[in-house]
C-alpha cells in the first residue's frame, strides 16, 4: 500500500516528466497504458506508471470527501499542487467499472495576452466598470488561461476587489494593486449560482465565474452585471452568435425575452478561441473570433436576430471585430497554419474558401 506521501511522489514525478515533454493533458485508465496529449495530438506513454496499481494511485490522490463523492458514482474535480508549487486540474471518473483520470497541466506562470497571441483589445474591454465579458471555446482551448491573463493584468494596474468562483481554482493570484478572493466550488461554496449571489454582498468590483452552466448561473451573472459589476465567464461554444443562442436557449421559454434584453444591456464582448496545430505539429496557435458590444450588435441581440451577427462582424472590422474565418485566413496568409488545418477548424467552409 502506498501512503499519501508516496502517492504525491509518484504523481509529482509523472507531472514533472510530462512537462519536459510539453504535455498538456495526461490520461490515466486502470488496465491501460497512460496517454499524453502533446500539442493537440494523443500518444501512448507505454512505460509510464506500469509498475503501479492505477486504482490505488488515483484513489490515493483524493481526500476523504472526494472519495465518498466518487464512490457515490460522481465524477470528481480538484486541483493538484506539486511540491514545487505547480498546479494541475484533475478529473477522476469511472468507465466500464474502471477508474480513470485526466490531469490538465497548467502554466507555471500566468501569461500575458501578448504571450498567448490573444487580441489585446480584450484588455480594453476589461477596463469597463460594469457589464459582462465572455471567453468561449471547446474544452482545452485555453479559456481559463485567457481569463487568468486578464485578471492578472487588472491586478497589476487597478485597485479593484476581484472575486473568482472556480471549479476548481486553477491559477492562484498574489494580490498586487487589487484585492483578490478566490472561492472553489465544492470547498468554499456549493455551486456557481449561490456563490454569485453571495458575492454581490461582498463589495466586489469584478466577479469571475468559472463557467455559466445553467439558467440559475446565467441569471445571477446578468443580475451582477446589471447592478454595476464587471462579470467575466466562459462557455463551451464555438462562436459569438452560437454563444448568444446558447445563453438564450438555456433559459426557460417564459424568461428568454427578458434574458435577451438583459444580455443586450450588459454585454461588452465575446472572444471565441481554438488552438490549431502549426509548425509541423510542434506547437499550437490560437485562432479567435472577437465581438464587441456595439449598438448594432446589441440591437440584433435585443431583436432576436442572432443569425445576422456574423455578417455584422464581417462589416465591422474597422471597430476591432473579426470572425473566426477572418482570423483563419490571416493565420494562413502569415504562414502559421495550412489550408488543411484551417478547413478542420472553420465553422463555415464555403465562407472560408471565399477568403482564400
Residue ranges and their predicted role:
Residues 1-356:
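Short, flexible helix-loop junctions that flank or precede catalytic/ligand sites
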